[in-house]
């Protein structure tokens, strides 16, 4: 029987999901670049873009693997059953969000698209001001000392 005091879902029910926010940032940046192209670096630097993007994908996949190994869901709308402290979570409390940021940075360099950097700013602002504080309140409420200890020992970003 479930405990009626426990929340029914994860920390983000009804909230615009971060993957959608970052997809919107990418699509907006590309659309703006098509309308008003703003290149910001020599084209030779574009070779770094695929490398940064690949690092982003690897970080995302490693983070997902740790969630699966801990037996908890990565989806913000589903119940969180464990605090993940292994893999990339040893260094950052938000490696999935870091992977989203790295992906947009990598695409920006790869495509030499300044607008992607511009649209990244509100996406990161939304994470920092709305999503992460809400997630942290949820985790503190549901995992008390376990999350407080983790929060004290691992930085939010890097």
Residue ranges of each PLM-predicted region?
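Extended, alpha-helix-rich binding/interface surfaces that flank or overlap catalytic cores
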Residues: 94
């Amino acid at each position: 029987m479930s405990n009626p005091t426990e929340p029914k879902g994860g920390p983000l029910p009804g909230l615009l999901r971060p993957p959608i926010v970052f997809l919107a940032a990418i699509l907006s940046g590309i659309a703006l670049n098509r309308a008003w192209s703003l290149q910001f670096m020599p084209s030779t630097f574009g070779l770094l873009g695929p490398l940064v993007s690949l690092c982003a994908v690897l970080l995302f996949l490693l983070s997902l693997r740790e969630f699966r190994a801990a037996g908890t869901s990565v989806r913000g709308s589903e119940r969180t059953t464990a605090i993940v402290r292994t893999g990339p979570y040893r260094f950052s409390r938000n490696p999935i969000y870091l992977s989203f940021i790295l992906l947009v940075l990598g695409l920006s360099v790869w495509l030499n698209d300044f607008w992607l950097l511009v649209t990244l700013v509100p996406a990161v602002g939304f994470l920092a001001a709305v999503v992460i504080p809400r997630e942290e309140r949820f985790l503190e409420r549901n995992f008390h000392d376990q999350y407080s200890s983790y929060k004290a020992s691992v930085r939010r970003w890097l």
